[in-house]
């Protein structure tokens, strides 16, 4: 299960980050950085004035959900329509803001992860010190995680009967 959770985090692009501040729950979708070489760490970035990053920088607990939708499953029976997906839920705690060199390293790794093959100075301008100083990155140490997935075709009672009325199958939504 930890290998599956790590694989889902490595494949995902958007995390939904949930936290409670002053009794009010929040969920914020965010790009994130995850590297299987440091499997219990996840990184978030944003404005130094960000409510979320400021709150988590004080060590607050957070829940993170990442879901990848792989396909729409249609059935000849309404009850058996479904979605193929991979998901992971993590429970973690925030830590203080990373220093400038750590922030630079995480931001470079994020660009490489989201935009493979791009290089600073060739494909985009090198980040200036003021750009790095204007961005907060915090590390989250994952305490617990669990993965869940649904794979496969429809499982309705008549889905394997080609002469039954209606249609059944999977619309593949996975990105190459």
Which residues does each PLM region occupy?
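Active-site-proximal "nucleotidyltransferase
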Residues: 1-15, 173-175
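Conserved hydrophobic/aromatic beta-strand scaffold that supports enzyme active sites
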Residues: 16, 27, 43, 63, ...
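Short beta-strand segments
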Residues: 11-48, 64, 74-80
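Short, structured beta-strand-loop surface elements
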Residues: 48-109
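Short gly/pro-enriched beta-turn/loop segments at secondary-structure junctions
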Residues: 12, 83, 132-135
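C-terminal edge-of-domain segments
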Residues: 98-176
């Amino acid at each position: 299960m930890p290998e599956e959770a790590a694989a889902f985090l490595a494949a995902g692009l958007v995390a939904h980050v949930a936290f409670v501040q002053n009794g009010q729950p929040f969920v914020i979708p965010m790009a994130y950085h995850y590297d299987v070489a440091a499997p219990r760490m996840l990184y978030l970035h944003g404005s130094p004035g960000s409510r979320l990053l400021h709150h988590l920088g004080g060590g607050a607990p957070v829940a993170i959900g990442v879901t990848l939708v792989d396909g729409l499953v249609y059935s000849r029976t309404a009850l058996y329509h479904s979605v193929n997906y991979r998901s992971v839920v993590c429970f973690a705690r925030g830590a203080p803001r990373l220093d400038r060199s750590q922030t630079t390293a995480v931001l470079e790794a994020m660009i490489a992860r989201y935009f493979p093959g791009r290089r600073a100075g060739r494909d985009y301008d090198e980040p200036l010190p003021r750009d790095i100083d204007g961005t907060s990155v915090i590390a989250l140490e994952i305490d617990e995680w669990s993965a869940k997935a649904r794979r496969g075709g429809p499982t309705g009672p008549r889905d394997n009967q080609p002469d039954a009325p209606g249609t059944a199958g999977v619309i593949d939504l996975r990105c190459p």
